[in-house]
Curated annotation (Swiss-Prot):
EC number: 5.3.1.4
Species of origin: Arthrobacter sp. (strain FB24)
Gene this chain is encoded by: araA
Binding site for Mn(2+): E316, E343, H360, H459
Protein name stated in the entry: L-arabinose isomerase
One cellular-component annotation, GO: cytosol
Amino acid sequence: MSNPNYTSANGTSLSQYEVWFLTGSQHLYGEDVLKQVAAQSQEIADALNGSSDVPVKVVWKPVLTDSDAIRRTALEANADDSVIGVTAWMHTFSPAKMWIQGLDLLRKPLLHLHTQANVELPWADIDFDFMNLNQAAHGDREFGYIQSRLGIPRKTVVGHVSNPEVTRQVGVWQRASAGWAAVRTLKLTRFGDNMRNVAVTEGDKTEAELRFGVSVNTWSVNELADAVHGAAESDVDALVAEYERLYEVVPELKAGGARHESLRYSARIELGLRSFLEANGSAAFTTSFEDLGELRQLPGMAVQRLMADGYGFGAEGDWKTAILVRAAKVMGSGLPGGASLMEDYTYHLAPGQEKILGAHMLEVCPSLTATKPRVEIHPLGIGGKEDPVRMVFDTDAGPGVVVALSDMRDRFRLVANAVDVVDLDEPLPNLPVARALWSPKPDFATSAAAWLTAGAAHHTVLSTQVGMDVFEDFAEIAKTELLTIDEGTTIRQFKKELNWNAAYYRLAGGL
């Protein structure tokens, strides 16, 4: 449940973005043909814009017929921060040597749409004028060759734009491209360092800035504490009233309750944290229970609410997971469900009914439920601070994906597992944290063995908004290894893929 009255500069709306639609042809066919190419390619762009599957505005560009125009268009796309990618279609034959400079310079994600204007052949009327005009079957093969020759990462979507599967795939790629755009400009604020002696939350922040674009920097938690303790009483009053309006607040935390001051302090944390992140221009952050300085509580509900408003978050200094949470928030914008930091905590191992119970100390995003969370206060046995306030809820049932990002020394590795989030078998009256229960695909034993074999992290992002296909496109755009665990996974094949990937990425990195 995101705060409906708060508008953040780090918003997740896809309306700020656009994708350029590029059509390839050549002057060989004459001006009349080029006019038809322009008209029909505009119709294709309009059809994409008319589909509810396509979340980002498609902007048609004039037909490209020579290398200079292609090169200039690529450079213009690179320079425009609102452009998150380009879609290319060769309506006629467009000699691919014209595309070499432009493709070599292009730094935005590329989708190759292999389509044509007509659905059916006009059997009785077809002549060679029709063949010259409608030869994407010919032109796109030339374009595919030069992309492969140059080693250009791209997604290829095949079919007529009236086919819902075509628009669905275009939309998936657009969402992945939006996530990439968000990461490329992401500023991430760390309060304190990583949890001591933990391995997987470490990583090369300089390499991450090179590979992903994200800028990861650290501030003293006492600078945050100063912002928290400087929150105005009137702002605290307003925010506490909002809590009582939006959530089911337990009586002891309400005005007049024995622990109302703890709720007010949680509101101070939220106000200070928001103001600090806004001043930094940060859309993601981390905290650590081992480094709380002058803060009286480990940030709990404040973190949950900031995640609900689109911020990325990682616990215990885990900046890599904060990146994933931010990307997932943007990629899932406008879709039902949510995305959150998650951690595999414990198992239900009844034979044939195995499940994973995921949670964290406090920080699970309420976007994972459509129900009204309950605001509670309970002791926290680590951190040495006052009892923290948190929202408690069960994640809604439905399909999802859990994704981890690990630093493997010579590269970053994404690992994604398709899951089914399920209802709790029984209530959990003594577990005072938000949680999710899921059945991993293809089954528990294969999933866990593959996850461990891959060296995947114990912190993840759980998304119930987007599926595996969005993360596959994201990894392709990011040129980052992705290992998928789903219905088709076997350990034998998974181990082979790990070995192949080790050879491929080491060779590719050295070329």
